[in-house]
From Swiss-Prot:
It comes from Pseudomonas aeruginosa (strain ATCC 15692 / DSM 22644 / CIP 104116 / JCM 14847 / LMG 12228 / 1C / PRS 101 / PAO1). Its EC number is 6.1.1.9. Monomer. It catalyses: tRNA(Val) + L-valine + ATP = L-valyl-tRNA(Val) + AMP + diphosphate. Residues 881-950 form a coiled coil. This is Valine--tRNA ligase. A motif ('HIGH' region) lies at residues 40-50. ValRS has two distinct active sites: one for aminoacylation and one for editing. The misactivated threonine is translocated from the active site to the editing site. Keywords: Aminoacyl-tRNA synthetase, ATP-binding, Coiled coil, Cytoplasm, Ligase, Nucleotide-binding, Protein biosynthesis. GO terms for biological process: valyl-tRNA aminoacylation. GO terms for cellular component: cytosol. Catalyzes the attachment of valine to tRNA(Val). As ValRS can inadvertently accommodate and process structurally similar amino acids such as threonine, to avoid such errors, it has a 'posttransfer' editing activity that hydrolyzes mischarged Thr-tRNA(Val) in a tRNA-dependent manner. Pfam families: Anticodon_1, tRNA-synt_1, Val_tRNA-synt_C. ATP binds at residue 554.
């Protein structure tokens, strides 16, 4: 093996070997174990969340594969309706062409062309992370097979009365001209206004204060043309007598009722609010409770209509209300209408006052435009009947959430679930399988031929297919079973469904997880006819944030690309990546400055294994995952440590007798100790992987390999390995232990760090007595409790403690590590005597001792530095070892320097001007500097005291 670890030299070639040999495919043997990759957007590229997700899933799938399970980890991508359509529209726009210029068919051809060119980007990146997915089964949500499954699901749900077409309020994107989901709406904090408007009372009604008008507070005066009522709180005494009376809607002249509803906050504004059921989600609910008309005043661009559209709550036209609107507003944009309405109120003397007001403004995450609640005809899934089985499946434990606390989030949403709007006014996506005749009748079927046959419509009847497509979440809601061949009862569907684990972020529990459970349980049945679940466990992880806990976003300039950490990136390229295409040049300057400070030389190349191990080590149960580059560096050093340890093992076992053919061996207490520690580590890593505590599994592995195997075992066995006079059986036993423990540790580490472990394993497998084409198909280590040796553990912990004690004294007294010293043991118990007799040669060599003896009873100890090992004292006589006055002088000088540092930094931090003006990270660095100096000062003072007492 090379002397230094170079991840790039091994990673790509190993992935190609694994993939070309079909090692990722199901073995066909053992109990099935399935994970479906949450399909990333085909438009996208890998972000840190994907990287984290893939590291976790691959750790699980490699672990179960090594346990002999018949594993299927199936990849795929999502067609990402709105995101993909926007990318292609932007490209066309750059050529001065719109999708409407091309027409639907030609535009869709362009989308497919773009998908073929760019769609492989994210799958290439998934490969780079070492993900052992079965690429032969890669799926795309617009594949022919999946498209058939989507149609089948829609038709069945419609036949079961669970899909209907209705007129309801949706999040309407006025730029993209489509309904969007709540997930695609971002609430922005903005400064706005609260307008207090007077609505005159009619029929001589008066308020308790004798006024002939109500003052209504609103943040959206532009919608008042569609007001259906004024609401007050039922217990608000100020307005009690007015409930059931009417107010006149200024500008329009319509009389609207004054109603009582607990939705009203008495403390907000005047305690009177306008109710506009067709333009506000909360008002829509109030409207349902009071049977108010729905008065739509906007068109699809959010411009005022020439005439309102008035409907009953069931969506039928309401002919009882005059739809007239003032002609001066016709065609006016909503925000222009806002200004005009406020001006007209002011001119009429009906504007009471205007207050500044903090608002949450909903905007489309892609278009950036203010979202309009808009009344429109859409297709809906009736979710309440579906939610019952989905709730029961989690309540009775058929589906478990890990961590368990996320079940409460799931229940709270499911028990208050609203019907799901599944239609989108886009061209790219699964077109709704519904047809309309000239009379407006709707027919649902798998295709037009089926519709004509089923409804006995002759070929002469003109049918037009619905223009809308389905919400992307509808097709991804069928992901676990549609990708296995449903509605056909394929062998893969029978074998690998239900799947075992879904790995996902908590932010899409509602949008994806819950809908998968509902749709799967309704559409897929067990052999006995009971609903089948999509997965047994939902592992929910937090969101990957930067080291300060900030969300990663382009505008913050803190986005990290996982592949830049794997392959490295120079500063200029990183700056270009972080600042290109930014709308605000000042922000770009700030981000460039911040990036130069954080990565003055760009990002070094750390390799895939270091990044994956970092992700696993961060996979705790919290909602936020703070990603720290320092950890990646630490785990890159861990990879180096493993590589160097392997080179040491190879040097000491290559061409040597390692006892793999059953030759007699003698195991020293050091060998028995490391074997015992290995059993405990096998138990711990397995237990934590089963509990989805990847952080604790990674920690156990790290501590065993770095602290026990590399830091101690490799040192403790050198005397035996390098002693030409050592018994052959003992040397053979040590060599066998050395290589077998390493080989087992590589198997344990493989799910986390597949590349480095495979490379080393291939080099040592013969000497370790193993055979096979790849580490990934080797059996998972199972602890042998019979090899846990408490006696050996006790003996070696004693040796370690004694050596650490000597090391500590050398450090405190400034004694060179190369200088041989005498030590005396005081208060030694019979067990200490035995341990000394067993390990004296080892201690003499490794602790660099001249002599070691036990203090006789009644003998007075010479002037010594002391360390404790249990009740036993380890004494290092100081005579001739140090020049006391010179050492005290050196310490005094260092103490003086540190006192100056403490005074300087402390003064800085007590300066109010500095603390008020300096950035938070600078203050934090200064505080850390102060704490470090104070700690060092305390240590030196203690050291000085010890030397002065000698």
């Amino acid at each position: 093996m090379d002397k230094t670890y170079q991840p790039h030299a091994i990673e790509t070639s190993w992935y190609e070997t694994w993939e070309s040999n079909d090692y990722f495919a199901p073995s066909g043997e053992g109990q099935p174990y399935t994970i479906m990759i949450p399909p990333p957007n085909v438009t996208g590229s890998l972000h840190m969340g994907h990287g984290f997700n893939n590291a976790i899933m691959d750790a699980l799938i490699r672990y179960r594969r090594m346990q002999g399970r018949n594993t299927l980890w199936q990849p795929g991508t999502d067609h990402a309706g709105i995101a993909t359509q926007m990318v292609v529209e932007r490209q066309l726009g750059a050529q001065g062409v719109s999708r409407h210029d091309l027409g639907r068919e030609k535009f869709l051809e362009k989308v497919w062309e773009w998908k073929e060119q760019s769609g492989g980007n994210i799958t290439r990146q998934i490969r780079r992370l070492g993900s052992s997915v079965d690429w032969s089964r890669e799926r795309f949500t617009m594949d022919d097979g999946l498209s058939e499954a989507v149609k089948e699901a829609f038709v069945r749900l419609h036949e079961d009365g669970l899909i209907y077409r209705g007129k309801r309020l949706v999040n309407w994107d006025t730029k993209l001209h489509t309904a969007i989901s709540d997930l695609e709406v971002e609430n922005h904090d903005e400064k706005g206004h609260l307008w207090h408007l007077r609505y005159p009372l009619v029929n001589g009604a008066k308020t308790s204060e004798g006024l002939d008008y109500l003052v209504v507070a609103t943040t959206r005066p532009e919608t008042l043309l569609g007001d259906a009522a004024v609401a007050v709180h039922p217990e608000d005494e100020r307005y009690a007598k007015l409930i059931g009376q009417f107010a006149e809607l200024p500008i329009v002249g319509r009389h609207i009722p004054i109603i009582a509803d607990e939705y009203v906050d008495r403390e907000f504004g005047t305690g009177c609010v306008k109710i506009t059921p067709a333009h506000d989600f909360n008002d829509y609910e109030v409207g349902k409770r009071h049977d108010l008309p729905l008065i739509n005043i906007f068109d699809k661009n959010a411009a005022v209509l020439a005439q309102a559209q008035v409907f009953h709550l069931d969506g039928s036209v309401n002919p009882n209300l005059d739809p007239s609107l003032p002609q001066s507003y016709a065609g006016m944009d909503r925000f222009a209408a806002r200004k005009a309405i406020v001006a007209e109120f002011e001119a009429m003397g009906l504007l009471e006052k205007v207050d500044d007001h903090a608002l949450k403004v909903p905007k489309g995450d892609r278009s950036g435009t203010v979202i309009e609640p808009w009344l429109t005809d859409q297709w809906y899934v009736s979710t309440k009947p579906l939610a019952e089985d989905a709730i029961a499946a989690v309540e009775d434990g058929r589906i478990q959430f890990v961590p368990k606390q996320y079940e409460n989030m799931y229940f709270s949403w499911m028990r208050d679930i609203q019907d799901w709007c599944i239609s989108r006014q886009l061209w790219w996506g699964h077109r709704i399988p519904a047809w309309y005749d000239e009379a407006g009748n709707v027919y649902v079927g798998r295709d037009e031929v089926e519709v004509r046959t089923k409804h006995k419509l002759g070929n002469e009847a003109e049918l037009r297919q619905d223009e809308d497509v389905l919400d992307t979440w509808f097709s991804s809601g069928l992901w676990t079973f549609s990708t296995l061949g449903w509605p056909q009862q394929t062998e893969f569907l029978k074998t690998f469904h239900p799947t075992d684990v879904l790995v996902t972020g908590f932010d899409i529990i509602f949008f994806w997880v819950a809908r998968m459970i509902m749709l799967t349980m309704h559409l897929v049945k067990n052999p006995d006819g009971t609903p089948q679940i999509p997965f047994k466990t939902v592992y929910v992880h937090g969101l990957v944030r930067d080291g300060q806990g900030q969300k990663m976003s382009k505008s913050k300039g803190n986005v990290l690309d996982p592949l830049d950490i794997v392959d490295g990136i120079d500063l200029d390229t990183l700056l270009q990546k972080r600042t290109s295409g930014m709308m605000q040049p000042k922000l770009a300057e700030k981000i460039a400055k911040q990036t130069r400070a954080e990565f003055p030389e760009g990002i070094a190349s750390y390799g895939t294994d270091a990044l994956r191990f970092t992700f696993c080590s961060l996979a705790s149960t919290g909602r936020d995952i703070k990603f720290d580059m320092g950890r990646v560096e630490g785990f890159r050093n861990f990879c180096n440590k493993i590589w160097n340890a392997a080179n040491f093992v190879i040097e000491n076992t290559d061409g040597q007798d390692t006892g793999v053919n059953g030759e007699p061996v003698e195991l020293s207490s050091v060998d028995r100790w490391i074997i015992s520690q290995l059993q405990r580590t096998e138990q711990e890593v397995t237990r934590q992987l089963d509990a989805f505590r990847f952080d604790l599994a990674a920690q156990a592995l790290y501590e065993f390999i770095w602290d026990e195997y590399c830091a101690w075992y490799l040192e403790l066995v050198k005397p035996v390995l390098w002693d030409e006079n050592a018994p052959i059986e003992r040397q053979r036993g040590t060599r066998r232990t050395l290589i077998r423990v390493l080989e087992t540790a590589l198997r344990l580490a493989h799910p986390f760090m597949p590349f480095i472990t495979e490379e080393i394993w291939q080099r040592i497998k013969g000497q370790a007595g193993k055979e096979g084409p790849t580490l990934m198909l080797q059996p998972w280590p199972v602890a042998d409790e019979g090899r846990i040796d408490a006696a050996a553990e006790g003996d070696i912990e004693w040796v370690k403690a004694l050596m650490l004690g000597v090391r500590q004294i050398r450090g405190e007294m400034n004694i060179s590590m190369a200088k041989r010293i005498d030590i005396i043991l005081k208060n030694a118990s019979p067990s200490d005597h035995r341990r000394l007799a067993d390990n004296e040669p080892l201690l003499m060599k490794l602790a660099k001792l001249e002599s070691i003896r036990v203090l006789e009873a009644g003998e007075e100890a010479p002037m010594s530095a002391t360390a404790l090992v249990g009740d036993m004292e380890v004494l290092v006589p100081m005579a001739g070892l140090i020049d006391k006055s010179a050492e005290l002088g050196r310490l005094d000088k260092e103490i003086q320097r540190l006192e100056g540092e403490v005074k300087r930094v402390g003064g800085k931090l007590s300066n109010e001007g500095f603390v008020a003006k300096a950035p938070a990270d600078v203050i934090e660095k200064e505080r850390a500097k102060l704490a470090e100096a104070e700690q060092a000062l305390a240590k030196l003072a203690e050291q000085r005291q010890k030397i002065a007492a000698l």
